[in-house]
């Protein structure tokens, strides 16, 4: 849209300067005849200023009406194209913070825009309600986590409503309710049946005093428990994992189909790593006896598996430290600092080859591996080790005369090229469920076990005879039992609910016990976007038809801190559901908007303690501690209670109004950048002035059109018509730019700037242009409609005022409907047909005298540019009657210099 940008720049720059320098226009109170559709319907008065009280009155009046408008869905709406807008749902902590306000202001603004564009929009809201914080908060208050959570949800729902945010509340979900976690359990069982959910021993953080497992977040920087203060120990426990590595290659490859994931694709790709190898499974033997245990090891060259010599493990491997039956044999063979051959044998479940396990001297294997398959044919290091330990092996790769490498001594893969054998062998391993999923050497499977109460119960029954058995689907949900007293100590709380734990095996009907771990809350949020498409379904997690209609999410908004883990798990579940034939789309999110933080000013003592503002002396050149006079380190950091740098959203809204805070958040920085919260900066005064200008412009228009004079466009003189034409061009340029920002880069700060510029241009119009010009009326209407998603309350009031004006000149607006129900403005076809323009600088005797617009296709034609300058208003004023000696047109810049007789 080169022409748009060029035409827009002609008007925006000087008008921006005028906007900053000019004081706001203030009108005295005046009676407006026939005013019947605004908050001033009783008196018909418009106040002289858009004061805080006026803002509050406007917002109070329009709040409920706007909410009702947003919630109405007609049969006609259901025929419109879909737009699925999703903002990351919050953990119900009990109180919204400014980060919530920012993300939900962004989603609300874009949702309103898309509705005005004629889209069928869902903008759902729910609650990520399980998790450790709720459990700990409930323990501290001697409450049950459920009552604490539900109370918080109720309060935060009211807060969202008071902020004027319009969500699709009919789609609300809460992850801690059985009607949701039933389907989380269902998906877990589907993963288990597909061989993608399994148990193995893994290291956990263990508090020896409280006798409980700690999350990483509960271990401080000194390695001590946040609660007891005890030194945290590492302990092996049997844990549940989801085999995310099985989808590593598919997810890595699918990133190429996500061009809109700016900045995030690289983070996802780095997290997954280079998918060049796979894991393969082995059974373990000691003294010729099968132990029944399994070992998984990685190789970057699975095609050469028939040349295996050993399986290497690191000294930190779980087999050496957990409860494995081979632990003693391995420890007996271990000599620290040396590569140690052990009596434990690994039997390939793919080829049935039997090789020894070697404990490596180096604790760090490649990537994040703790086990690796040794294949001398493809690794000089493996060759060195095999020869040093006297391990037999076969060379299985032969080079052809043409340089092609082929396999030998490799069963049915013999004669294949390495590339073909890689594909065939990994496919066979996957079919046998003994590994073969192409992945990297750094990606690990997802540990989902949590030894806590407040989470989704894992739907597995442990039977002495049958082993782990999934709960039958018809018996879901496995309801989280009520536990009278939670202490946060003593291991998994569910283990104390004996009536719940003790059960019958679904398979053999013998005595069994339920799994007492709960799921990581990331599992709940890994599929919630599906549930929003069909939130009341009682027969399945979601209906395929509805999911196929709404998915993928058109725009997903949330913090950049979730760009790796949450997005990875969500993508994994989506890929899995696709392979289960539950949905036709593999990727869940089309576009991402990772918004920045809102940071507050932090004042820190040399000791590291953060001070409240009331404990700081600001009278000197630099802030100091009021009590000790110590100098303070001043930084901008993420808002938090502990840093005393936060602001209460409700307090700040009460002080400035909803629309003002919305505009400040949108205008202060691009969405992806951090906002340094400081209401003394230009951003807040700027949006306050702009609202006043919108108010003044509308009032001026109403006054002109209700003065008793009928508008007659033919009465405008040529100069006034030119001004009106300029407004028409400016309006079209702004529509094009604003629409692009809303749909492409989401630079809503630029949207506000563009609309400020259009407001300033309108304020320069003469009274006759305001009265008689259809271009002025159209530009003002377009301005209010485009501002409506940003500031819905004030624009609703101003639009209600516009509808009172008699003898309207524009018939393409729905005058009997509110501003939020207007169609989004479009660029006039005549504007698109106009030639691209450049701003040609005009110099006279080397002195800059101004600029004129010149069609781009003639900008390098000196004769035509010369003629256009002479015909322009600027040329007639400065060159008419003067003797022009010569003119020079710059070949590099848009500049023409006239040398004239003095």
Swiss-Prot record:
Keywords: Acetylation, Aminoacyl-tRNA synthetase, ATP-binding, Ligase, Mitochondrion, Nucleotide-binding, Protein biosynthesis, Transit peptide
Location (main, coarse): mitochondrion
SUPFAM superfamilies, per database record: Anticodon-binding domain of a subclass of class I aminoacyl-tRNA synthetases (SSF47323), Nucleotidylyl transferase (SSF52374), ValRS/IleRS/LeuRS editing domain (SSF50677)
Location of this chain's protein in the cell: Mitochondrion matrix
Cross-referenced Pfam families: Anticodon_1 (PF08264), tRNA-synt_1 (PF00133), tRNA-synt_1_2 (PF13603)
Name of the molecule in the record: Probable leucine--tRNA ligase, mitochondrial
UniProt-listed CDD domains: Anticodon_Ia_Leu_BEm, LeuRS_core
Catalysed reaction, written as an equation: tRNA(Leu) + L-leucine + ATP = L-leucyl-tRNA(Leu) + AMP + diphosphate
EC primary class: ligase
One Gene Ontology CC term in the entry: mitochondrion
Residues binding ATP, per UniProt: 641
Signal peptide residues on this chain, from the entry's feature table: none
Source taxon at top rank: Eukaryota
Keyword Amino-acid biosynthesis: no
